[in-house]
Amino acid sequence: SSPKQLPGTWSSGYNSIACGRHGGQGAVQADGVLKLWGNNQYGQLGQSNNTLYSSPVQVGTDTDWKACFASGLSCGGTKTAGTLWSWGRNNNGQLGHNSLTDRVAPFQVGTDTGWDSISGGWDGNLAFLKENGTLWVTGDNYYGQLGQNQAYAPSNKARSSPVQIPGTNWAKTNQAVGFQESFGLKTDGTLWAWQYNGEGALGQNSNVSNNSFYSSPVQIPGTNWSDISCRYKAAVASKTDGTWWVWGSNAEGQLGLSQATPVKLSSPTQIPGVWSQIISGHAAMLGFKA
């Protein structure tokens, strides 16, 4: 019920930290070692087995990891050479290996280099950002998650190899994939959304029914956006002036507006106070006061 320090050199200069929904947690140490722990049902801890680990274990022997991610039941990371790796559950082809085979150890995504960062949703999609500002996605496409401007249809095919989201000026490390909603920040400070719009999760000030969706990126009102976090039908984002804004489901009061009504907001609404960081969880948000 209170924070406990983990073994290792996490606090003396870690490069990346990740926390999954049902999967593993982990971090890249300052020495380039990747360690994971937690649920390992689909091999998402990269140990070539399905054993649960309650303390950090090293992934392989490599010491050139740059960043890591944990999402749903899949994990992965980038290396200093710019290569991209993923492992764990692959039921929708989300690992990007051109197959539906689960992986219990790190497996390289294609042969490209220049990969910068990764984000992932609950279980069915991953998003990969390249250093050249291009954004790529894999996995389920039921609600248009892949941003390919395909009409809503249960028959929309998942993609097991990365496909590019339109545009070439996506900002590094500022992409977010939630339950069934996706967001991307561009270098010009504009914020874009696509996928499922139930509860107003995409911030479009429009239809908030459970059946509305956008299968290609649409701009969220406003400019000068600087960060975005989402998890389950709700999102929080910051602007360069230090203000923070929320939208989506408010059924549990998770939007921080001192009330549980309205139960949904379909356009960005400012949170009172001065904050340095806010992240979105499942029916909750956490933040640091400035």
Where is each model-derived feature located?
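Short glycine/serine- and acidic-residue-enriched loop/turn motifs that recur at repeat junctions
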Residues: 1, 37-54, 87-104, 138-160, ...
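Tandem repeat domain/solenoid detector
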Residues: 16, 30-33, 80-83, 116-117, ...
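Conserved beta-strand position repeated across blades of beta-propeller domains
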Residues: 18, 27, 69, 77, ...
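Acidic/polar residues in short coil/turn loops that connect beta-strands
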Residues: 31, 47-49, 80-81, 97-99, ...
